[in-house]
From Swiss-Prot:
Cofactor section: Mg(2+)
Name of the protein in its database record: Type 2 DNA topoisomerase 6 subunit A
Signal peptide location: none
UniProt-recorded Gene Ontology molecular function terms: ATP binding; DNA binding; DNA topoisomerase type II (double strand cut, ATP-hydrolyzing) activity; magnesium ion binding
Keyword DNA-binding: yes
Subunit structure: Homodimer. Heterotetramer of two Top6A and two Top6B chains.
Length: 369
């Protein structure tokens, strides 16, 4: 098992090296041929999202933006691209090392004119490299700064780490917090499972409630804590468990416009990273709740929608990820009632209500029980 994972890692490193060299060679050849260097990238805007019938996710369309040395700004962007490409090849891939996105920003202090002015600039450049190579930043050994999310449930895995191989049962071998998902889940192999569903949960409070109430055991459920807007590794492992193991996925969030976008990022991909949708999105994922109709049906405690909430809901009515009749009805209902609710509002009905009444009823309604 360890050799299998190690071989995959070697293959990924070779592919990343090849793609980065191709990019560097393209820019070099433009200089050689006395052509003003330039690169083209998909426009990362909502208006450039297109639905892929092949993969059932939203991806970037045909609109492009150009980075060209015809302008001073474009020339600096290309300079920084070449410095970053060289660094990733020589320092990361050649030496089997990695850096966080924050570290890359500080590393650039030694690049003189190619130094990044702020971290947002270096983050965007890594996204550019993903688009240009059609690879994920994990292939370049780039790590996020934040900790990974956690999961808890009846699944056994093998994880290859820098210190060797680990065999882990995500119920029996972990503490109350669950198994911490690593930033690169390609280093994980699934060994066995008894799961009948995956419940991806927005808040830590609801994740802990389902664990304490034994929902994972009662329904053979893998519980995944999304920690708000989910990290890429969290979305990727959900997709892998769904596609490779055939485990259905339900997403359980708060009942507000920002939480609906959390669901959309799991199911269809985020606008900012639509180039990775086919790699990370799980189009089979279903929205469990909290629905605006649940607020009405269960008479949950609520907060009034803010102007920001209202504007976000109206924006979602034109978001291609929410174009179904179901979403238009739910969003319009929420605008009509002017209310939002948190997952923990179910506690007002008793600590067991969410696991004994709401979830079983809703999962049956969704055809998952």
């Amino acid at each position: 098992m360890a050799r299998k994972i190690s071989n995959k890692k070697t293959q990924r490193d070779l592919l990343a090296r090849e793609k980065l060299f191709e990019l560097a060679e393209k820019i070099y050849n433009q200089f050689e041929n006395e052509v003003v260097p330039s690169i083209s990238l998909p426009s990362r805007t909502k208006s450039n999202l297109e639905y892929s019938n092949e993969s059932d996710v939203w991806v970037y369309g045909g609109r492009e933006s150009e980075r060209s040395a015809k302008t001073v700004k474009g020339a600096f962007q290309l300079l920084k691209t070449t410095y970053a490409t060289e660094f990733l090849i020589n320092e990361h891939l050649a030496q089997s090392r990695g850096s966080t996105l924050r570290e890359l920003y500080y590393i650039s202090e030694g690049w003189e004119a190619a130094k990044f002015k702020e971290q947002a600039e270096s983050d965007r450049l890594i996204e550019d490299l993903e688009l240009l190579t059609n690879l994920q930043r994990e292939y370049f050994h780039m790590r996020p700064e934040e900790d990974g999310a956690t999961m808890f449930g009846p699944i056994e895995i093998t994880e290859q780490t820098n210190r060797g191989e680990r065999n882990i049962h995500c119920q029996k071998d972990v503490g109350e917090g669950g198994y911490q998902i690593p930033f690169n889940v390609e280093n994980i192999e699934f060994k066995a499972h008894d799961a009948s569903m995956i419940i991806a949960i927005e808040t830590g409070g609801m994740y802990a409630r389902l664990m304490e109430n034994g929902f994972d055991e009662a329904y053979n459920a893998i519980l995944v804590h999304l920690k708000g807007q989910p990290a890429r590794s969290t979305r990727r492992i959900i997709k892998r468990m769904n596609e490779e193991l055939g485990i259905p996925v339900a997403v359980f969030t708060d009942g507000d416009p920002w939480s609906y976008r959390i669901y959309a990022s799991v199911a269809y991909g985020a606008i900012k990273s639509a180039h990775l949708s086919e790699f990370m999105a799980t189009p089979a994922a279903k929205f469990l709740g909290l629905q605006p109709s649940d607020i009405v049906e269960y008479e949950l405690s609520t907060d009034k929608l803010t102007e920001q909430d209202i504007n976000a809901l109206r924006s979602e009515l034109s978001d291609p990820r929410f174009e179904s009749d179901y979403w238009k009805e739910q969003i319009q209902l929420q605008l009509d009632i002017g209310k939002k609710a948190e997952q923990q509002a179910f506690a007002g009905k008793g600590l067991n209500f969410v696991t004994e009444v709401y979830l079983p009823n809703r999962l049956k309604e969704m055809g998952m029980l």
